[in-house]
């Protein structure tokens, strides 16, 4: 959760001088150790926002240019920094683009391990988003609840690959490690307790009258607006658009798994409001739990340690490829061009947070200042996805 810090710019007016009704507020930036480095320059008329202009770039580290200076395999650890809240997805996007470029086939067991690791990461990312959003509008208890479940997930992923935040788990052609003995049973046992906890989470916050009043009918994004502005993931589905790359592109082993695609329905307000965007993520956690159960059962149909495909002796591809996956924040695409060298000629990421930030700016005018934090939290932007 970002700590909200305001500084007031009164345009250099002397104390007691007559002023117009507009006030400029600087919201942020925040320290890099918090959940994102964001700054908004906000103009207000009393408590009503006239405009909120995002100032991006505080976490820019030229990661795409770094991708053009590393070998194809050597760039994998850097992809963890594209979205450090859910790092598995950028791992998979880069690996998938390189595999497409080089014609590498990934073993089925490795594909299942990718799905399992990514769906765990999706739940962990949504737990942060849901807990932080509740905290931002004044509900304290849900945040430690959400962090507790994320800690269980971090423990599982640490057992799987040795890291808790930046994983470097996926490899071009597969994954780095098979799951340890007994690991699948631990995850299933956790799922047995996680699903009832999500029911309690609904009772505690999702269906809480005060919480609903803070979010329902706030910052409504229609389906047409969402598509026109290029929103993806839960932000697009929150506007009632049923679009999920796990279904539409049917990549990896997702066609073998059964799950639903939750969308906003305007249950307590209008389709596409802040509550819909919140609750789509709640329902996605339940769907990810379904996917995990199926994947953990089906993975045993494939031989152990068959986790890395046949790689070319030299990774010096010539051509270009684009691969996209459904990350926790939506469509994450990776475009790579090879020119026969050990390094990519061009590496490019397409992420969901950049367009979400543009929509935050568009939807801010007319809101109360107190609702801006809810709007930002409902889009679940993460700074390094914007600053690439």
UniProtKB/Swiss-Prot annotation:
Q: What is its quaternary makeup? A: NDH-1 is composed of 14 different subunits. Subunits NuoB, C, D, E, F, and G constitute the peripheral sector of the complex.
Does the keyword section mention Nucleotide-binding? no
* Family membership noted in the UniProt record: Belongs to the complex I 49 kDa subunit family.
Reaction(s) catalysed by this chain's protein: a quinone + NADH + 5 H(+)(in) = a quinol + NAD(+) + 4 H(+)(out)
Naturally occurring in which organism (per UniProt): Sorangium cellulosum (strain So ce56)
State the EC number(s). 7.1.1.-
Q: Which UniProt keywords apply?
A: Cell inner membrane, Cell membrane, Membrane, NAD, Quinone, Translocase, Transport, Ubiquinone
| Membrane topology according to the record | Peripheral membrane protein
Query: Can you name a GO cellular component term?
Result: plasma membrane
Q: Which InterPro entries match?
A: NADH_Q_OxRdtase_suD, NDH1_su_D/H, NiFe-Hase_large
Q: Which GO terms describe its molecular function?
A: NAD binding; NADH:ubiquinone reductase (non-electrogenic) activity; quinone binding
What are the subcellular locations of this protein? Cell inner membrane
Q: Does the keyword Membrane apply?
A: yes
Q: What is this protein called?
A: NADH-quinone oxidoreductase subunit D 2
Instruction: Give any Pfam family that matches.
Output: Complex1_49kDa
The record's annotation in Gene3D superfamilies points to:
Cytochrome-c3 Hydrogenase, chain B
Function description: NDH-1 shuttles electrons from NADH, via FMN and iron-sulfur (Fe-S) centers, to quinones in the respiratory chain. The immediate electron acceptor for the enzyme in this species is believed to be ubiquinone. Couples the redox reaction to proton translocation (for every two electrons transferred, four hydrogen ions are translocated across the cytoplasmic membrane), and thus conserves the redox energy in a proton gradient.
Where does it primarily localize? membrane
Tell me the organism's taxonomic lineage: Bacteria, Pseudomonadati, Myxococcota, Polyangia, Polyangiales
